[in-house]
Design a protein with these regions (language model features):
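A structural boundary/capping signal
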Residues: 1-283
Length: 283
């Protein structure tokens, strides 16, 4: 007897990618986000497109080039020769978070550009990491001469003074001034790959929530629950979206699960009431 195994769903595929932190495939996991919008997308083709960029870049850099020269070659190649840059005209277009679209249009937001930039930088042997800077994702490279922080939206390298200036609105809004001020270095800690993918998904989550696009928001929430299985806020948010879509049994399960875990949650009373309303509608 012969039988054909069905390929895994895009969600199951994503879940398999993000299961293990030790060998987390950042580029592949980030690229797979786009399968919600492009269900027939060939992720291996996306990875192949990045490999082609990597090969073109390698031809421009000698094997014995020092790290600083490699970094300069990457900046020239990525921003000037290939034309990658920030989408200043349509910053909130969901395609800015879909790597297949970013590769095609050469336009994205800081974090999607950073994922591509990091892949190319690491392919050159650079010690490059993502940085979850408040409000604007950054990348940094450790060189023998010191640390370089780059804005992936523009390709600009930022001085300490630039970074402090960019931080001021966040610090003032959070009351982190004077005696409560947080050292700059704490904002420049490496961002793990799992957190990078979570930030990409949360960008899409906010776009779809603002548009009240519940089906797309549910697709993003499904990924976040699998990516962050112990972040109970994501379970709650999926439950609320399910309720909006009329899937009350699944919503009941998620909201009850959230309340079972979030004893001290500030929204406990509101979610309890929402759960009561759902149960009344069910019974």
């Amino acid at each position: 007897m012969f039988f054909q195994l069905a390929p895994p769903s895009s969600l199951a595929y994503f879940e398999s990618l993000v299961r293990d932190d030790e060998h987390f495939p950042l580029l592949e996991a980030a690229a797979s986000i786009a399968q919600d919008e492009y269900p027939d997308l060939d992720i291996q083709q996306v990875l192949g497109d990045v490999d082609q960029l990597q090969a073109r870049l390698h031809r421009r850099v000698s094997n014995d080039a020092p790290p600083l020269q490699r970094l300069r070659a990457l900046a020239q190649f990525f921003y000037r020769d290939m034309g990658f840059g920030g989408n200043v005209n349509n910053f909130y277009d969901p395609d800015n978070s879909h790597l297949n679209a970013v590769l095609k249009t050469r336009r994205g937001i800081p974090i999607s550009l950073a994922v591509l930039w990091l892949e190319l930088a690491q392919g050159l042997g650079l010690k490059a990491m993502g940085v979850g800077f408040p409000g604007h994702f950054m990348v940094k490279v450790s060189l023998p001469q010191g640390q370089v922080v780059v804005d992936p939206f523009t390709g600009e390298s930022l001085s300490r003074e630039d970074l402090i200036e960019r931080l001021q609105p966040h610090q003032q809004a959070m009351g982190l001034v004077g005696d409560n001020e947080v050292p700059l270095g704490l904002y420049l800690q490496p961002c793990p790959p799992r957190d990078i993918v979570a930030r990409m998904l949360r960008n899409l989550k906010e776009i779809h929530r603002t548009a009240e696009d519940w089906p797309r928001l549910l697709a993003v929430s499904e990924r976040l629950v699998r990516l962050l299985p112990t972040v109970w806020d994501e379970l709650r948010d999926r439950g609320l979206v399910l309720a909006e879509l009329g899937h009350l049994q699944q919503a009941e399960r998620d909201l009850a699960g959230y309340l079972a875990q979030a004893d001290d949650a500030p929204d406990r009373a509101a979610i309890t009431q929402r759960l009561r309303d759902i149960r009344r509608a069910l019974h």
